[in-house]
Structure formats: structure tokens, C-alpha cells
Amino acid sequence: AGEVEKREGMMKQIGGAMGSLAAISKGEKPFDADTVKAAVTTIGTNAKAFPEQFPAGTETGSAAAPAIWENFEDFKAKAAKLGTDADIVLANLPGDQAGVATAMKTLGADCGTCHQTYRLKK
């Protein structure tokens, strides 16, 4: 797969992981520590690898905003923050639904902050 497809796949994996966490935090699915750990691990791993998925020459053909390449250091910092916050959640793995909801607020805010600036509106 090309770079665009690869990074879109990584984003979809994060979206799926966030969906799993959301279902637990809302009580739609029962709390399961293994599910939470796997979801947060996916988020952290993918976030840390994001900056390498946006090489020069891949600025078109996706929802990636030109601002990524114009402000690459800030983009990298935002990806790193998501990775670090995921590591913090993993180190203090939530033990119940409320803990997952708290973790979701932090991770979701990281996603939103980056998407607001660096994802084109559909």
C-alpha cells in the first residue's frame, strides 16, 4: 500500500480502538482489561509512528491538510502527545468503566486538537 493508504489504515485502527473504549465507557460493552489494554496500545503505537507516514510528496489525495507539512514540528508534537498520553494510560491501566471514560477524555482531546488543525473537513 502507498503512504496515504497506510496512514489512513493507521487512523482507522485508532478510530476502531477509540470505538472499543467508547463502548466500554458508555456501558454498551462490559469492562474488559485486555480490550482496554489492546485499544490503548494500538493508539499509542500508531500515534508514535504517524510523523513518518507523511513524507513530502503525499500532500494530496487524502484528508491530510497542507498545514501538516507547513507546521511539521507542531504536527509531530501533537502526535507525540497522543503517544505519551497513551503510555500514561497504559502505565495506570483503568480498572473500571469510569476509568476508561476518564482516559477517553484525554485521548479524545488529543485526537480532536490534531484533527481540528490537520484534517481537512469533509
UniProtKB/Swiss-Prot annotation:
Binds 1 heme c group covalently per subunit. One of its GO terms (biological process) is electron transport chain. SUPFAM superfamilies: Cytochromes (SSF47175). One of its GO terms (cellular component) is periplasmic space. Gene3D superfamilies: Cytochrome c/b562. Pfam families: Cytochrom_C_2 (PF01322). Monomer. Low-spin monoheme cytochrome c. This is Cytochrome c-556. It comes from Agrobacterium tumefaciens (strain B2A).
